[in-house]
Amino acid sequence: MFTVFLLVVLATTVVSSPSDRASDGRNAAANEKASDVIALALKGCCSNPVCHLEHSNMCGRRR
């Protein structure tokens, strides 16, 4: 539950941070990745060994 809380805080921080035009593409990519991580965490994917392996780039390599 704490992990989900941290992910939500991270996503909120990424979304609400001010940006300039040069970094808009990078921010969009970060927002998308944060959204994917939150979606996986909420689904319990990162705690499921099979799903974790399939999405190790989102869940982290270690288990």
From Swiss-Prot:
Residues 17-43 form a propeptide. Residues 1-16 form the signal peptide. Expressed by the venom duct. GO terms for molecular function: acetylcholine receptor inhibitor activity; toxin activity. It holds the Pfam family Toxin_8. Keywords: Acetylcholine receptor inhibiting toxin, Amidation, Disulfide bond, Neurotoxin, Oxidation, Postsynaptic neurotoxin, Secreted, Signal, Toxin. The modification Cysteine amide is found at C59. Alpha-conotoxins act on postsynaptic membranes, they bind to the nicotinic acetylcholine receptors (nAChR) and thus inhibit them. Belongs to the conotoxin A superfamily. This is Alpha-conotoxin-like Sm1.3. It comes from Conus stercusmuscarum (Fly-specked cone).
